Amino acid sequence: VAWYETLAIGVKGGELYDAVMSRLGDPFFGIGLNPGHLIHLDEWLHSPIRKGSTMKLASGMALQCDVIPATGTDYFTTNIEDGVALADHATRKQFATQYPEAWSRIEARRKFIRDKLGIKLNPEVLTFSNLAAWLPPFWLSPGMAMVMSP
């Protein structure tokens, strides 16, 4: 939740890193990799989302939430791995005009994330997948999801 609610244009990568690690950085539920990165070829080459990063997130960035708790034990846990993009007001307006059907799906996903999952996304966060912020508590029960209490 902290990853999605902190994500915004102008946020420093280190701030996003700290938001996640302040909640999951303990010895048992530690994060095995960085908790987010750019997508495609940039996934393993460079990430603005790392400890101490001063790189600001910008409009046009396609990012992946990549929160994989690594217990270091025989116990496994569920994880969130999905992509979003950041778009400033002008880009969102242009996208909505050029691709109204896609825009309506993005808006429906954002509404679901807000109203059903209880996560407050910043307006510049565009969700392109139905998996965004969907966290099943058990691997074998993908139809269940964790939500924030009101």
Language-model segments: residues:
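Active-site neighborhoods and metal-handling regions in enzymes and metal-associated proteins
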Residues: 1-150
